[in-house]
């Protein structure tokens, strides 16, 4: 495969920079695996953070490393699994790299903290925009005008 497009797996995978190696998914994915699946017409590569059962449907709870929204993906929608990637010319093997395993476990464990920080960051940005608009230093954008009718 080629370089990732987007920032949902940052800081592990960098937009249009690193090169990924994805293989077909065989069997059950484990927690911390990075799954390739289809969302609409786009391919998405996100980390498995858990499993779910909904009646007869079984699947994975998935989230990007730079995301805070959990997704519930049925098993049959998973197309592949990340087996390794090249970062600045250095090969990282997702099966054997101790550093990769430590990063994966730490990143998933910090999910609640990351979610709280992203929420706080968004609130500070919104408040900052309101102050700039109130002081006349910035025009209110069309999206916020439409939401405040």
Question: Locations of the language-model features?
Answer:
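Extended hydrophobic leader/signal-anchor segments used for secretion and membrane insertion
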Residues: 1-149
